[in-house]
């Protein structure tokens, strides 16, 4: 055991631990989620500390041997070492100070070892004086959130692009499958299944653009702002250099905010990112709901789609298979929307020169980036790639619907078309059969008017027939 102290007193710390007294106090105080810090966030914060050490060495303020030891320790954390040394709860009071000091203590103790000294030799490498040099939790912590959000957005955007690509494949594959379009959950006019798939892809593409645009704001950082944004204890050269070094470490461009006070007390960039995720989730919910409805049945529903069977659906009804993959995407999106509300409240509740609610904001933002990625990948891998279409069912509903009478208006007139619709409703017969029985159009004419190409593009279906008849 070793003894460490802060201004509240002295505590014993097990020799094998790389964290110290302030982390132990956080462990005593915060038992909230039962979870540990996000591993990507630990990596992001270590990147911030590495960049800071490099910048402080450039200005000459940080001893080179100490700085190099801190950089080496940070590199080890970035590589995934010491993951078990970051045990603090992600939801905590103190605006992230417990997380910041957890990192400072781990880096300091590892740097002590690198320099040939035992852990706790804070006269050699100090968590505060060296690892936190020219920093405050109030600039290091939000900067690490931004770095992590950027890192986590990449696999999410890749997942969304996979979804777009697969939907576009389906759009091409189903381009000739005509089905009944529906508005108000009622029969409307025909549409191709390919057009529906293309529309889903278009909505997701907007989500990708929206998220990318929001994440761009995370490249503006407040490193060098220190406590309240005035830059107290941070040299001007350091403020410039730390943004450059962070860009080099992360491989992404970072820029110092024009107004460090604003960048320290406002966290609206995270609301922007969260909003992009939420709106994308809304689009995904619509798509998943449509898939579930089109797959309803199999005997007593719409039944146009055949979703892959992934597991038995009921503990009491033999042979039942449920749309579990579409359902789980729905639930993922509900969670994302709920977490967005938490993020919104956290962003709103800053006071004066700082927003102390960043820990819960970060926790929910990271979860949303992860949940949405996993939900989308699950939907693509477990549902979309193996999706099948019941073409006969699509044709069945199309032929039975009176919605196709809309396309016949230019050929038969409103009164005749209305009478056909009324008879179809009352008798249950198909519009096509009634037209043929009454000799209003030939079968070839009907097939031409009701073909996918004629029915699903701007203009009058069967316009050539009208010209031939001189109408």
What is the meaning of each model-derived region?
Residues 1-471:
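Conserved, well-structured ligand/cofactor-binding cores
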């Amino acid at each position: 055991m070793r003894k460490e102290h802060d201004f509240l007193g002295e505590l014993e710390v097990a020799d094998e631990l790389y964290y110290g007294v302030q982390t132990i106090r956080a462990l005593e105080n915060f038992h909230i989620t039962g979870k540990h810090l996000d591993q990507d966030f630990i990596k992001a914060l270590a990147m911030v500390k590495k960049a800071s050490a490099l910048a402080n060495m450039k200005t000459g303020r940080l001893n080179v041997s100490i700085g190099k030891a801190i950089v080496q320790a940070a590199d080890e954390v970035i590589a995934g070492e010491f993951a078990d040394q970051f045990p603090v709860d992600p939801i905590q009071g103190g605006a992230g100070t417990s997380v910041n000091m957890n990192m400072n203590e781990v880096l300091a103790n590892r740097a002590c070892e690198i320099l040939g000294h035992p852990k706790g030799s804070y006269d050699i490498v100090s968590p505060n004086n060296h690892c936190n040099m020219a920093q405050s939790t109030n600039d290091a912590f939000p900067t690490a959130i931004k770095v992590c959000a950027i890192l986590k957005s990449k696999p999410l955007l890749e997942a969304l692009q996979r979804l777009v690509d697969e939907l576009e494949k389906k759009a091409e594959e189903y381009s000739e499958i005509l089905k009944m379009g529906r508005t108000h959950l009622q029969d409307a006019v025909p549409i191709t299944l390919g057009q529906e798939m293309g529309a889903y892809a278009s909505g997701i593409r907007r989500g990708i653009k929206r998220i990318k645009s929001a994440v761009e704001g995370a490249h503006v950082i407040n490193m060098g702002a220190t406590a309240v944004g005035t830059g107290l204890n941070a040299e001007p050269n350091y403020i410039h250099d730390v943004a450059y070094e962070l860009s080099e470490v992360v491989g992404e461009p970072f820029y110092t905010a024009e107004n460090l006070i604003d960048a320290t007390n406002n966290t609206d960039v995270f609301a922007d990112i969260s909003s992009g995720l939420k709106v994308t989730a809304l689009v995904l919910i619509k798509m998943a709901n449509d898939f579930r409805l089109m797959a309803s049945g199999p005997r007593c529903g719409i039944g146009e789609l055949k979703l892959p069977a992934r597991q038995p659906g009921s503990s009491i009804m033999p042979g039942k298979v449920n749309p579990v993959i579409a359902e789980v995407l729905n639930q993922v999106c509900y969670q994302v929307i709920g977490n967005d509300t938490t993020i919104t409240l956290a962003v709103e509740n800053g006071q004066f020169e700082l927003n102390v609610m960043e820990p819960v904001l970060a926790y929910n933002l990271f979860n949303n980036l992860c949940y949405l990625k996993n939900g989308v990948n699950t939907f693509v891998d477990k549902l979309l790639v193996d999706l099948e279409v019941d073409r006969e069912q699509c044709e069945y509903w199309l032929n039975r619907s009176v919605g196709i009478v809309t396309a016949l208006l230019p050929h038969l007139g409103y009164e005749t078309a209305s009478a056909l619709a009324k008879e179809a409703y009352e008798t249950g017969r198909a519009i096509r059969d009634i037209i043929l029985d009454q000799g209003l159009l030939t079968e070839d004419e009907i097939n031409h008017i009701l073909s996918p190409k004629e029915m699903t593009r701007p203009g009058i279906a069967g316009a050539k027939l009208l010209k031939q008849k001189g109408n």
